[in-house]
Amino acid sequence: MVLSDSLKLPSPTLSAAAGVDDCDGEDHPTCQNCFTVKTPLWRRDEHGTVLCNACGLFLKLHGEPRPISLKTDTIKSRNRKKLNNNNVNTNANTHSNDPNKIFKRKKRLLTTGGGSLPTNNPKVSILEKFMVSGSIKPLLKPKETVPNTKECSTQRGKFSLDPCEPSGKNYLYQINGSDIYTSNIELTRLPNLSTLLEPSPFSDSAVPEIELTWKLHNEEEVIKLKTKISELELVTDLYKKHIFQLNEKCKQLEVELHSRASVQSHPQH
């Protein structure tokens, strides 16, 4: 026997009569298997027989009628939400002892402003007081960058008015209970002219390198100029040779013209 799909009877009186006793003598639907009149949902099998929800589900799952021994007078409701809440509470209890979880939970409460820590409590750490007081995100001391001595000396060799001392602001922090005092001290000032003109100890090692670089540069320039001069002298010699050849040719042509002119002026008789 195979059960058809779940069926809610079309008559509203049937569903209303599910939890009402037969006190007025009217006919109420009755399960043909366990003869109960209380059920949250009425079903039918493939032959149209009226069954309660429990008998209908049992028949659909197992393919056989539900035994009478399984009949109960109380209707049990599912408690999924309660189980889920219990699971959540169980998980919360199991992870409540984790120090990382506790720290994150405290940090979340502090950042959202949902909680405050008593400053008089000796168990409260300085970090928690620091996070509660003043600003939630404290200022961190900037990382100091140490200038490279080689680069600094090279720059000083090229630009004699460029100091190598690092500039910046020094942030001082004092933690007293829950108060934070921050003070900015300007350490950088314009150097005096005498300070700029004084030789730097870092530049002594770079002086030979700079002098060698300038010497090499000057030698390259001298070689380039000598090459250019030799090229110009060669071109000048070529032009001189060509001019000399042209002068010789002009002289020969003049001699020929004079000879022809003399021959024409004295014809033979």
From Swiss-Prot:
Induction: Sensitive to nitrogen catabolite repression. It comes from the Eukaryota. Signal peptide: none annotated. GO terms for biological process: negative regulation of transcription by RNA polymerase II; nitrate assimilation; nitrogen catabolite repression of transcription; positive regulation of transcription by RNA polymerase II. Keywords: DNA-binding, Metal-binding, Nitrate assimilation, Nucleus, Repressor, Transcription, Transcription regulation, Zinc, Zinc-finger. InterPro entries: Transcription_factor_GATA, Znf_GATA, Znf_NHR/GATA. The keyword Transcription regulation applies. The keyword Nucleotide-binding does not apply. GO terms for molecular function: DNA-binding transcription factor activity, RNA polymerase II-specific; RNA polymerase II cis-regulatory region sequence-specific DNA binding; sequence-specific DNA binding; zinc ion binding. One of its GO terms (cellular component) is nucleus. Coiled coil: none annotated. It holds the Pfam family GATA. SUPFAM superfamilies: Glucocorticoid receptor-like (DNA-binding domain). Its main location: nucleus. A zinc finger (GATA-type) spans 31-55. It is found in: Nucleus. SMART domains: ZnF_GATA. Negative regulator of multiple nitrogen catabolic genes including the allantoin pathway genes. PANTHER family: BOX A-BINDING FACTOR-RELATED (PTHR10071:SF281), TRANSCRIPTION FACTOR GATA FAMILY MEMBER (PTHR10071). This is Nitrogen regulatory protein DAL80.
